[in-house]
Amino acid sequence: MRHNKAGKRLGRTTSHRIAMYRNMVTSFLNHERITTTDVKAKELRSIAEKMITLGKKGDLHAMRQAASYIRDKKVVTKLFTAIAPRYAERAGGYTRIIKLGIRPGDNAPLSVIELVEEELNAPKGTAKKKADVKKTAPKAAAQATAAKVEDTPAVEAAEPAAEEIVAQPAAVVDPAEECEAKAD
């Protein structure tokens, strides 16, 4: 029975699975974003966050622990010098998983796993202010364009240059709208 056993098997032997995780963590910390399947991304998240936590400790023992799992010494150096200091004030949640859809060949659900890049020093009230700005922005934009239209004098348009004609895409006409226009 499989009681109290953490992690997914992913249809691989233990050695293959561990090697795959080590390769994925090395690539993830090197590129800071990779595309993989949903299940692999969820498993990778826990390992990567443990590595970043080791990087935040910053001592020699933590560096050796990370080096025993990560395959490339340059990536270990990057983890301790560039990645971990970014998350010094963050208590966890260093990664984000974004679902992409399905892979055409085998219908596997794909995701992008990436490091979170937002600033923690922003005041907590900014989210509400941004939502208010988003609600009022369309109204203000509509009023501004209406004011511009009223203020601009009517000028007859000259023939457009040949470059402008080529640069403009052809108008797409919906057949349903065309039938309605003929019926009127």
From Swiss-Prot:
Protein keywords: Ribonucleoprotein, Ribosomal protein
Gene Ontology CC annotation, any one: cytosolic large ribosomal subunit
InterPro entries: Ribosomal_bL17, Ribosomal_bL17_CS, Ribosomal_bL17_sf
Gene Ontology molecular function terms on file: structural constituent of ribosome
A UniProt-annotated Pfam family: Ribosomal_L17
One example of a Gene Ontology biological process annotation: translation
Assembly and oligomerization: Part of the 50S ribosomal subunit. Contacts protein L32.
Assigned protein family: Belongs to the bacterial ribosomal protein bL17 family.
Name of protein: Large ribosomal subunit protein bL17
Species per Swiss-Prot/TrEMBL record: Geotalea uraniireducens (strain Rf4) (Geobacter uraniireducens)
